[in-house]
Amino acid sequence: MDDVTIVTAFFDIGRGFWSNTHKRTTKFYIQSFLNYLDYPYKIVCYIDDRCIDYVLEHYTRSPHRSVTFIPINLKWLEHNIHAWKQLPKDAEIMKSSIYKDYLNNRLTIMYPNGVRPGKDVIKMFPENEIPEYNAINHAKIDFINHAMQNGYIDTSVTCWSDFGYFGTQHKNDQSTFPKGTLDRDRFSKDRITFFIQKEIVEQDIDPLYILVCAPEMFTGTFWGGPTNLMPSFQALYHECVEELYSVNISDDDQHIYLRCCLKNADLFDLKLNATGEWPKGLLFFQKKS
């Protein structure tokens, strides 16, 4: 068995009923996840208990037996996951007049010279309006540490890979899928590896700029590194979330990864993705034939 564990999770926050371009159905997520079962990846999967029977039925037909499934529900999240316990805080901030003013000034901050392309439309993203979206994304590091604390991980490297990875990164196109499993030696031995879409510059230090302009920088679909660094990363992550709360900002995991890196750059190994597409982590870290 390879010395790498993948942790992933799915909890239905109602995204299938969203009426915008960010809509994704439960079917989309499940069909994406089933592709994992074609590989001998060692996986710890936290899965909505409303979906687990369907997935387990498919798992019985998989040639591999390397997935540990943990059923979850709302009560489980409220009891076990720090990020979910913070959900009321995210909701409170999103409803506040201060936060709404930040976002209502989005066009002014993005175009301080007054020159704006196209129509003056203030675009909102899920991380600005849906507290459950932020909570479930902040929970990634909490799921990893829960798996560690409960003995589900015995490998030297641990990765987060999104439940819907094959759908979002590969469009479920099997011709683009990885051919092999993950190579422990391709990960940094003393840092956590993240893909970034652009270099960090001085203006990125300002959390209000990141909230309002929402540049594509850190990606949260796939990241990983030495298992023994995950508790330190969790503590740093929680600290950075609290710092944003203190200035009345709720934002998604991509913003928090940036804040963590600014606070402790030595913890991170950053891979600049220059393809113009979202990075395919399972492909990048696969064993070379």
What does each model-identified segment do?
Residues D142, T155-S156, D183-R184, I196-I200, ...:
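Non-transmembrane, aqueous-exposed alpha-helical and coiled segments at domain scale
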Residues C45-R50, I72-L74, I196-I200, L267-L283:
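Acidic carboxylate-rich catalytic motifs and surrounding loops in phosphoryl-/glycosyl-chemistry enzymes
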Residues Y165-V241:
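Conserved catalytic core of nucleotide-sugar-dependent glycosyltransferases
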Residues E132, I136-I192:
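GT-A fold catalytic core of metal-dependent nucleotide-sugar glycosyltransferases
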Residues I6-V7, V44-I47, V157-D162, T193-I196, ...:
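A structural signal for short, well-ordered beta-strand segments and their strand-loop junctions
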Residues M1-A135, A139, F143-D154:
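N-terminal anchoring/stem segment of glycosyltransferases
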Residues F10, I47, N73-W76, M148, ...:
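Short, flexible loop/turn elements at secondary-structure junctions
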Residues Y165, L211-S289:
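Catalytic core and acceptor-binding pocket of nucleotide-sugar-dependent glycosyltransferases
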